[in-house]
Amino acid sequence: MEQSNDGQTAHTLLHLASAEVESLKEGITFLRNKESGKNFIIYKNGEELRACKNLCKHQGGTFIKDIEDLGNRTVRCTKHNWKLDVSSMKYVNPPDSFCQDELVIENDDENGVSLVELSPPNPWDSDPRMAVCLEGGEVQVTYLTHACMDLKLGNKHMVFDPWLIGPAFARGWWLLHEPPCDWLERLCRADLIYISHMHSDHLSYPTLKKLSEKRPDIPIYVGKTERPVFWYLDKSGVKLTNINVVPFGIWQEVDENLRFMILMDGVHPEMDTCIIVEYKGNKILNTVDCTRPNGGKLPTNVALMMSDFAGGASGFPMTFSGGKFTEEWKSQFIKTERKKLLNYKAQLVKDLNPRIYCPFAGYFVEEHPSDKYIKETNLKNDAAELNMLIRNTSDVVTWTPKPGAILDLGRLLIDPTDKNGIIDPPPGTKIFKDSWDYDTYLSIHSFSFDDEIFHYPSWIKEYFTWAGFKGYNLVLRMIETDEHFVPLPKGYNYLVDFLDLSFPTERPERDHPYEEISSRATVIRHVVKHGLLWDDLYIGFQTRIQRNPDIYHHQFWNHFQIKLPLTPPDWKVFLDREKENNATLQNCSIM
C-alpha cells in the first residue's frame, strides 16, 4: 500500500506476471486473487486493458459471461440480471443508470500488470482518539423495534430511526415487534435523534407527530442528501423546529466524549446514509439500509456494528406477473436471493470484524389481510440464522434483539461471555404485535380517493406534467383497482407515452417498451394528490406489474421514487381552472 501527498492510498488488488498478461485473450477475462478471494474482470482491446472488481454496483451481485453478447464485451449480474459493458464501464441494462468504478492499470519493468485501487483518506481517521475502557452501564443500547435503537452514551441519549406506530410505505409494512410501552418517554428524553433517510420505516411521520406534540424542539440530525430527508415536513402537519442537516464525512461533536459522523451510500447517495457514533474512542457503526455504505469503505474492528439483514424490502418479484414470473420462479428466486444476502452479510461482518454485531432494520410484516399473498410469498432472512453463520466463521459476538432488550457495551467488550452483557426483557413481555389499528391509517387514503380533483379526467395530464418525466421511450398503462387488484368498473385506466408525454387512447405503432401497473385506487390517488414518491406503491406492495420486454427502466423508477418535485401539484389552481372551463362550456351551450 502506497500513500500520496494528498493522503490518498493505492492498494494493489491483483498482480499478473508477464506470462499471465500475454495469455489474456481479446475481450473479457474473469480473474480471482486466490489469497484474498476477491474477483476481477479485465477487458482487452488490442494493447488497451481496462479492469474492475467483479461486483455489481446495484446490489453487490457477481458477474458472469453474458451468453447473448457476441462481442465479448458484456457481463451479466447473477442477482438481478443487470448488464455491464466492460469496454465502456457503463451499465447497459438498465440503460443510463450507473458507471462501474474502474481500477487503475499499472505496468511494471518486467511487463507485468497490477490492478490498483485508489482510495481517499478515511474520514473517520481524522482527529483519531484512542479507545478508553468503558465501565459497565456506561454505554447501553436498547432495541425498541425495527431500526429504532435507544443509545445511552454516558450522560447522553441518542435514538436511531424512530418508527414506533402506524404503517410504512402507505399500508404495506407494519411493525413486527411490539415496542416497549415507554417508547414515547424514551424519545422525549433523547438528547438527539438520527434519521438515516426518508423512507417511512425510518422517517415515520405518525411517530414524529406524537413526539412533536410533547417536544417539538428535539434536535434531529440528517445527512445532506440530494433530496432532503424532510422534504415533506411542511405538508405533513408535523411541527419540528430543530432539524439539523450536516455534511458527510465530518465529525459532529456532541460533547467532549461523544461525536458522530454521517456517511453517504455508494449506490443511492441522493437519499441513503449511515452513521458512525464514537464515545470515548469506541465506535458504533450503523449501516442501516445502505447497499454499499460509503462506497464499501468502512471502519474495521469497531466495538459494535448494526445492519439490515432480512431482504424483501421491494415489490420485486412478488408483485410481478407474466412471462417468467410464475409462482415457481418467484419462489426459487426469493429463496436464492435471501441466501445470497445472508452470505453477503456474514462475509461483510467477517471482513469488518466488529467486536459485536446486531442484525436489525428488517422486523416488518405485511400484516393487512389484503396482503396475505405478499406475506406468504415474501419470505425473509432469520436474524438468528445469520448470527449463527457469523459465529461459525468468526469470533464476533452476536445479538438477536428483542423489544426492550439491553446490550451493555462496556461489559461485553471486557468479557464477551458476561451473562449480564445482554439483558432480555422480563418474562411475559409482549414481543410480537397482534393488533395494528388498520382503520385509522387506511381511512386517510379513502379521503384522497373521494377528492374533487378526480372528478376531472384532466388530472392525469396535470399530474404527469407536474412529475416532469419525459423524453424516454416507455409507454405506461395505469389501471385503478380495488383491494384485490381487480380493475374498478368506474376507475381510471389510461396510457402515458413518456417519449413525448402524451396520453394516447391506444398504444403507438412504433417499437416501444411497455409497462402495465395496476394500483389500489385509494393509494395511488393519495400519492397523486399529495405528490408523494412512488416508493409507497412499489416498496409498499400496492401494485401489480407486467412489462414487455422484461427490462428494469432505471430512469423511470428512479425519477418517480426519488426525483419528483419537492412540492405537490397545485390542485387548487387546477380545480379553479377546470371549474372555469366547465362554466364557459356550459355558457356556450346555453347560447
UniProtKB/Swiss-Prot annotation:
UniProt-listed PROSITE patterns: RIESKE
Catalyzed reaction equations: CMP-N-acetyl-beta-neuraminate + 2 Fe(II)-[cytochrome b5] + O2 + 2 H(+) = CMP-N-glycoloyl-beta-neuraminate + 2 Fe(III)-[cytochrome b5] + H2O
Key word Cytoplasm present: yes
SUPFAM superfamilies per record: ISP domain, Metallo-hydrolase/oxidoreductase
Pathway linked to the protein: Amino-sugar metabolism; N-acetylneuraminate metabolism
Ranges where the Rieske domain occurs: 16-114
Cofactor note: Binds 1 [2Fe-2S] cluster per subunit.
Main location class: cytoplasm
GO terms of biological process kind: CMP-N-acetylneuraminate metabolic process; N-acetylneuraminate metabolic process
Enzyme Commission (EC) number: 1.14.18.2
Keywords: 2Fe-2S, Cytoplasm, Electron transport, Iron, Iron-sulfur, Metal-binding, Oxidoreductase, Transport
Binding site for [2Fe-2S] cluster: 56, 58, 77, 80
GO molecular function: 2 iron, 2 sulfur cluster binding; CMP-N-acetylneuraminate monooxygenase activity; metal ion binding
Localisation per UniProt entry: Cytoplasm
GO cellular component: cytoplasm
Reported cofactor(s): [2Fe-2S] cluster
UniProt-listed Pfam families: Lactamase_B_3, Rieske
Domain of life: Eukaryota
PANTHER family to which the protein is assigned, alphabetical: CYTIDINE MONOPHOSPHATE-N-ACETYLNEURAMINIC ACID HYDROXYLASE (PTHR46522), INACTIVE CYTIDINE MONOPHOSPHATE-N-ACETYLNEURAMINIC ACID HYDROXYLASE (PTHR46522:SF1)
Membership in a protein family: Belongs to the CMP-Neu5Ac hydroxylase family.
Name of the protein described by the UniProt record: Cytidine monophosphate-N-acetylneuraminic acid hydroxylase
Species whose genome carries this gene: Xenopus laevis (African clawed frog)
